[in-house]
């Protein structure tokens, strides 16, 4: 969280004023004389222990006939050491508007029984780089063994979908979620990665109360190669029925969302279609020989000349005619532009909504519309995708975390003259592993003085790997590009002594044709050499760049997550200097392979050939899946650490005879 601005903000008067206007909602009760809780010695080495995590979502009919939502969070936390104090000495609230606040309370309870109550005048605003605003307040007087207690309630427009992540790095002794709504509104709640006790109370004066409780939720740290957030315990909720207006009819289904999306994106005025027709004709897209060429031409044009901003409320950013004029679109607006162009060209396509698989999922059995955050366009004939809002990815490449997971496909269907869409939940495949790579080709020679190496190196990036680099190069100044090159070379072989460098295929359009991004550099380096008497020690293992080494003392919790399937191929050609021989070339032979049902899914293999004075080293490392189960963790570590072990290989060059 990058802090840009910290402004004092007195909220006390706002809270008092608002409280006088609130409908009757349940107030969070506090113990008038708090004492330090008894906590099991089993938790004494934890930086902090969350004694209570209580949340309440209450839906209320207001005087205007609208439904308002009130959200309450109440936590009590024991801090055991300096790390715990550092983590909880400031409390952040995701509330930006004072008029939304119903109540805020906080206090610190010291081991000697002293209580320090929050002065509400000390609540401040913190503005982020992206413009979002949080409220923040400091917990005063904290020492080891003290407890932090805070609660807040705020109101907002009702959201009929949501998720509450109830697990973090700290253990939680008691978790309680309560959802309160008028009895006509029937909510469903689904737990993920947890098994809470649940009960429903329909006797509370026209309200239904859903309660979910858990005890002893363990704290989980993030792990290397893991999707952390999506694997934490959470509760998702949605409005399933409104028995006052649609009794017995399930609301907010996936089919309902598909129809809504299709309707929003495929309604065009005659004037809009006329403008799009002129755009298509002026660019000659209808004359291109095939569908992929048309798709690529349209995408490259729109991403070159138009800007997209996610949260623009301006209706001009939705109107196709205004978008074509102003070159600025909202997310919905730019999808409408793509849709109208592909309609004009007669290209068959489907709208797709996807989630970021590291954070949440689109669940076929539970229709949480909030999880479908990101739009894609799918072309059934090619079985490929386009990402209309990601300027850094080009067909058929999409942001990797939006794939290898389920998506909502809006499949069009016609009844007479009426066309709509039905939902199909199915996987969004990523491109095959052999299309994405990070390769190195090096030719290495010892200089005449035998104290440094001349390395002629190519770093070759394809597929998803190339997209990130192209973004850096296309949105950078020349000075920034040189800095990127310098860092890439340094990270690869540890030297900044670059004699020459050039890049190839840096333009975004090269993604369409699968051309790799290439950095070609010639470098001098003495860091890979050492002398030991009359021997030369060549640290050839470092010529592939530093590799990850994995050791984990605790048991693995999460499945292994790879951002995208890929391989890394490295070839090294080393000219053995005259008069020398390599004493230990066999050190270059390594093999770690894992197979499922007889088919390789990951591996590391290195080998060599020695022909005359030419040493040719070939290394292949690959990961062909995005997820590996915990049961394969030890095998995964062996392969990851094989590349790290290769880093440590040192060839011994001895004088002949």
What do these predicted ranges mean?
Residues 1-25:
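Bacterial Sec-dependent N-terminal signal peptides
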Residues 92-118, 172-189, 472-502, 568-594:
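Solvent-exposed beta-hairpin/edge-strand motifs
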Residues 75, 148, 177, 298, ...:
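Cysteine-centered nucleophilic/redox motifs
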Residues 22-36, 155-159, 163-169, 176-313, ...:
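Secretory-pathway-linked proteins and extracytosolic
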Residues 332-421:
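Hydrophobic/aromatic-rich core segments of domains that either
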Residues 104-167, 197-232, 288, 443, ...:
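A surface-exposed beta-strand-loop module
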Residues 21-93, 430-459:
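Early extracytoplasmic/domain-onset interaction patches
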Residues 416-528:
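Long hydrophobic segments that form regular secondary structure
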């Amino acid at each position: 969280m990058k802090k840009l601005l910290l402004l004092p903000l007195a909220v006390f008067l706002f809270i008092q004023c608002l409280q006088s206007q609130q409908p009757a909602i349940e107030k969070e009760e506090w113990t008038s004389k708090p004492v330090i809780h008894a906590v099991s010695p089993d938790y004494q080495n934890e930086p902090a222990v969350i004694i209570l995590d209580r949340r309440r979502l209450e839906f209320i009919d207001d005087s205007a006939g609208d439904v308002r939502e009130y959200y309450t969070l109440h936590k009590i936390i024991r801090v055991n050491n300096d790390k715990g104090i550092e983590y909880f000495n400031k409390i952040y609230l995701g509330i930006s508007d004072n008029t939304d606040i119903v109540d805020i309370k906080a206090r610190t309870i010291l081991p000697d029984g002293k209580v320090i109550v929050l002065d509400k005048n000390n609540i401040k605003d913190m503005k982020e780089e992206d413009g979002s605003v949080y409220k923040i307040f400091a917990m005063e007087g904290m020492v080891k063994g003290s407890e932090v207690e805070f609660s807040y309630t705020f109101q907002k427009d009702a959201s009929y979908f949501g998720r509450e992540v109830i697990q973090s790095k700290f253990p939680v002794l008691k978790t309680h979620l309560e959802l309160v709504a008028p009895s006509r509104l029937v909510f469903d709640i689904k737990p993920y990665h947890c098994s809470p006790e649940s009960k429903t109370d329909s006797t509370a004066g026209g309200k239904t109360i859903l309660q979910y409780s858990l005890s002893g939720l363990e704290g989980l740290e993030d792990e290397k190669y893991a999707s952390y957030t999506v694997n934490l315990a959470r509760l998702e909720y949605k409005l399933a029925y409104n028995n006052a207006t649609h009794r017995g009819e399930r609301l907010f289904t996936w089919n309902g969302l598909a129809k809504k999306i299709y309707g929003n994106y495929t309604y065009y005025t005659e004037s809009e279609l006329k403008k799009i027709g002129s755009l298509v004709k002026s660019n000659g897209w209808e004359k291109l020989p095939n569908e992929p060429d048309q798709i690529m031409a349209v995408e490259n044009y729109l991403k070159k000349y138009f800007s997209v901003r996610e949260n623009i409320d301006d209706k001009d950013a939705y109107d196709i005619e205004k978008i074509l004029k102003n070159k600025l679109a909202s997310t919905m607006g730019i999808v409408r532009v793509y849709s109208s162009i592909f309609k004009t060209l007669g290209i068959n396509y489907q709208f797709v909504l996807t989630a970021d698989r590291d954070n949440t999922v689109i669940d076929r059995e539970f229709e949480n519309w909030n999880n479908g955050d990101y739009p894609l366009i799918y072309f059934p004939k090619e079985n490929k995708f386009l990402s209309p809002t990601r300027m850094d990815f080009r067909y058929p490449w999409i942001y990797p975390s939006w794939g290898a997971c389920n998506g909502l496909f809006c499949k069009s269907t016609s009844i007479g003259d009426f066309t709509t869409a039905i939902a199909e939940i199915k996987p969004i495949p990523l491109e095959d592993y052999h299309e994405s790579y990070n390769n190195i080709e090096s030719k290495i020679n010892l200089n005449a003085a035998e104290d440094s190496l001349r390395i002629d190196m190519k770093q070759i990036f394809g597929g998803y790997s190339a997209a990130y680099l192209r973004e850096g190069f296309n949105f950078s100044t020349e000075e920034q590009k040189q800095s990127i090159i310098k860092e890439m070379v340094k990270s690869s072989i540890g030297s900044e002594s670059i004699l020459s460098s050039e890049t190839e295929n840096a333009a975004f359009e090269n993604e369409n044709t699968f051309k790799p991004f290439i950095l070609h550099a010639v470098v001098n380096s003495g860091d890979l050499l050492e002398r030991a008497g009359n021997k030369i020690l060549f640290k050839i293992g470092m010529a592939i760049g530093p590799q990850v080494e994995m050791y984990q003392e605790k048991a693995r919790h999460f499945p292994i997550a790879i951002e995208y399937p890929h391989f890394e191929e490295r070839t090294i050609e080393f000219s053995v200097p005259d008069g020398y021989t390599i004493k230990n070339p066999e050190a270059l032979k390594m093999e770690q392979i894992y197979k499922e049902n007889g088919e390789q899914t990951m591996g590391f293999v290195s080998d060599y050939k020695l022909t005359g004075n030419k040493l040719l080293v070939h290394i292949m490392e690959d990961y062909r899946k995005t997820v590996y189960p915990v049961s394969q963790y030890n095998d995964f570590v062996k392969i990851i650490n094989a590349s790290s072990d290769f880093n440590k290989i040192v060839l011994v060059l001895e004088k002949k005879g």
